[in-house]
Amino acid sequence: MSQASQAHDVTEATEQRLRVDLAACYRLVAHYGWDDLVFTHISARIPGDAHHFLINPYGMLFDEITASSLVKVDASGEKVAPSPYPINPAGFVIHSAIHDARPDVVCVLHVHTPQGVAVSAQKAGLLPISQQATVALASLGYHDYEGIALRDDEKPRLVNDLGRKTALVLRNHGLLTVGRSIADAFVAMFTLQRACEIQLLAQSGGVELVTVDPRIVSGVKSNVEAVTRGGGGALAWPGLLRRLERLDPSYKD
């Protein structure tokens, strides 16, 4: 086999692995109840090709998405492989902006969970009242609502608000996380979403809340790296895939 053929096979295998993981991510978002019919989106950069991405077929529910149904697009949002489905134009504006500005990011995950939107509408945003919140706050930004994300002129502001952070609260809109892998982006979202759920439960008690000392919050990032043994989302991801295998392995199709 020639070197060119070997390289082609490696590229195809890498893309297929990415497709399986991204389809798994969509199924997990649906499993945890974070989906919003067909109106949110998760994208992944194809390794070795900074200009091609995978994103959901617009019109498919997240629990229907499979590895083969994901749409491959270029930096302009044009399909580079046959697909009967379009892509969400708002999704492309958000995702293309981040992928273009952050070459370190492989995956961008965006949801409209009720808890996330509720916290995004609170002036104080995410409060340091739980361990989950301290983890999220270690790398969290905020982006003001500008309407449905269809305009390219919003991209610089979105990118600036994210900066080098891992997560973004989109005011009056939802939550967004990024990661060097699909696993990292998913686990970051799991933590942020859980922090929002805890905050709303705590606030519903109608009593004064105890907040974590800012000095503790500032040291959380190194603590997390120690707890995960530097593995990030990869520590939990295999178990999540095993869960999907038990529930419905068709995501790999």
Which residues does each predicted region cover?
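Class I SAM-dependent methyltransferase SAM-binding "motif I" and its flanking Rossmann-like core
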Residues: 114-156
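Divalent metal-coordination and catalytic microenvironments
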Residues: 44, 98, 112, 158, ...
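An anion-binding catalytic pocket shared by soluble metabolic enzymes
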Residues: 19-109, 116-127, 133
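A contiguous binding-surface segment within folded domains or other stable secondary-structure elements
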Residues: 141-177
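A conserved C-terminal secondary-structure "cap"
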Residues: 2-16, 21-25, 166-253
